[in-house]
A protein has these predicted regions:
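Sequence/structural signature of beta-propeller modules
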Residues: 1-80, 85-87, 401
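Repeated scaffold domains used in trafficking and secretory/extracellular systems
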Residues: 31-32, 79-93, 122-134, 162-173, ...
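Structural motif
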Residues: 54-58, 106-108, 144-148, 183-189, ...
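A short beta-strand motif characteristic of beta-propeller blades
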Residues: 70-84, 113-121, 152-159, 196-202, ...
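Hydrophobic beta-strand positions that form the internal "hydrophobic ladder"
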Residues: 99, 136, 174-176, 217-220, ...
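Non-cytosolic head/periplasmic domains of membrane-anchored proteins
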Residues: 117-223, 230
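Solenoidal tandem-repeat scaffolds enriched in leucines and small polar residues
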Residues: 184-278
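Intrinsically disordered, low-complexity segments enriched in Gly and acidic/Ser/Thr residues
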Residues: 283-373
Length: 401
């Protein structure tokens, strides 16, 4: 077979004035088309992102729908996660993806499949549970042993040198135990993640009321109570955990301080007559007085606000729910005519458990969701993503608004 070839210079050259511009023009059109499509896509995505970020509640709702897409939910939006014996459930605490349950006779951890990850027989008279993140501490008020739990079970247990008054978990995972101690009117011991004591403070002259560790774990705050000039007052004492010398000591308020919580870089004291915000120098930076109203409940959120439930009378169902920022300013306020069984706050959300329904608000007390028929629910635990764990007599569910 014979092949013929043609030299390059024998091919027709074409019209350089016309052909070249036509080819370049086609490429420009394609590039412009892709450029416009890309720009339009970017603008749409930017608009969606801006809308979600502007409305943080909508962003959390989208995140919940993605995280719990496979969860089996009933018609109310609840996913049943845990089942347990009603006789062994007195106190509850969410523990990462698990649930800690404590009664007078048993301490348990149930994993996310409702399987028993840990179980121990105890002999408690006044059981109590406290949790933060993936760490919980169970104890008997007046007893001498604390059990520190992880989502997988027991992390460590310890016998403390005196009757336990209260115990809590700091943001860094350390455990703060307030207890009685011989020769003192109360003591605070801080334990690390393996149960070793890393700091201890004993109050020799005033009665210890409560204690807390700052969010970075570097400062211990203790509230003591004593009589000055014939009046009982609450005092704040601050220590750096790497030193045995007090940083500051100052009077906080007259009367009793019920709770002390880390708040931003300082602390918030929940007292008999108001809320007090304290810095690490012992100074009171802001206050919120109750103005003669009675304190029913208070929750200090890790989102840097406090939700306080006040009443004009010591008894009765009508209460005022108020949220307050770290400068003592009201963020929102509403009057509740229903009896409140439990109150919980986390992130930017507040959960209010009433006798007939669960209501979820944002920190400005705008109602976001309401769930009726909750008569079997004993406790509620708000989560920072806008969901809430509801613990009942024999089961616990996750409410996904």
């Amino acid at each position: 077979m014979k092949y013929t070839t043609q030299k390059l210079y024998d091919l027709p050259e074409g019209n350089r004035q016309e052909d070249a511009p036509r080819r370049v023009e086609k490429k420009k059109k394609r590039r412009r088309k892709w450029l416009w499509l890309t720009l339009l896509t970017v603008l749409i995505l930017a608009g969606v992102a801006a809308a979600l970020l502007w409305d943080a509640n909508a962003f959390d709702g989208l995140r919940r729908s993605l995280l719990y897409a496979r969860a089996e939910k009933d018609e109310t939006g609840c996913a049943k996660l845990y089942s347990y014996d009603s006789d062994e459930a007195r106190c509850f605490a969410p523990l990462g993806g698990s649930l800690a349950i404590l009664s007078e006779g048993r301490l348990q951890v149930l994993n996310e499949h409702s399987e028993v990850a840990y179980s121990a027989t105890v002999h408690f008279l006044a059981p109590a549970l406290s949790a933060n993140g993936d760490t919980a501490v169970g104890y008997d008020i007046g007893g001498d042993t604390v059990y520190v739990l992880s989502p997988l079970g027991l992390r460590w247990q310890k016998t403390v040198p005196g009757a336990v008054l209260e115990a809590s978990v700091a943001d860094n995972g350390n455990v703060v135990v307030c207890h009685e101690q011989s020769g003192h009117k109360g003591a605070v011991t801080v334990y690390d993640s393996v149960g070793e004591p890393v700091f201890a403070y004993g109050s020799a002259s005033r009665f210890l009321m409560t204690g807390a560790l700052s969010r970075d774990g570097n400062t211990l705050a203790a509230i003591t109570m004593g009589q000055e000039t014939g009046v009982f007052e609450s005092f704040l004492t601050l220590y750096r955990t790497d030193s045995d010398k007090a940083v500051a000591s100052a009077a906080v308020c007259p009367g009793i301080v019920y709770d002390l919580c880390p708040f931003d870089s300082g602390f918030c004291a929940v007292a008999e007559e108001g809320l007090y915000w304290l810095d690490r120098n012992g100074s009171t930076t802001a206050t919120y007085p109750y103005n003669g109203l009675f304190l029913r409940r208070c929750q200090v959120s890790d989102g840097n606000f406090a939700a306080v439930l006040l009443s004009r009378y010591r008894t009765g169902s009508e209460t005022d729910l108020i949220t307050v920022d770290g400068e003592g300013n009201e963020l929102g306020g509403i009057t509740l005519s229903r009896e409140v069984l439990d109150l919980s706050a986390s992130g930017r959300y507040v959960a209010v458990l009433c006798t007939d329904r669960l209501i979820i608000y944002d920190k400005f007390l705008t109602e976001l969701a309401s769930l009726p028929f909750v008569s079997q629910t004993r406790a509620v635990f708000m989560r920072s993503d806008g969901s809430a764990v509801m613990a009942g007599a024999d089961s616990a569910s996750l409410y996904l608004p």
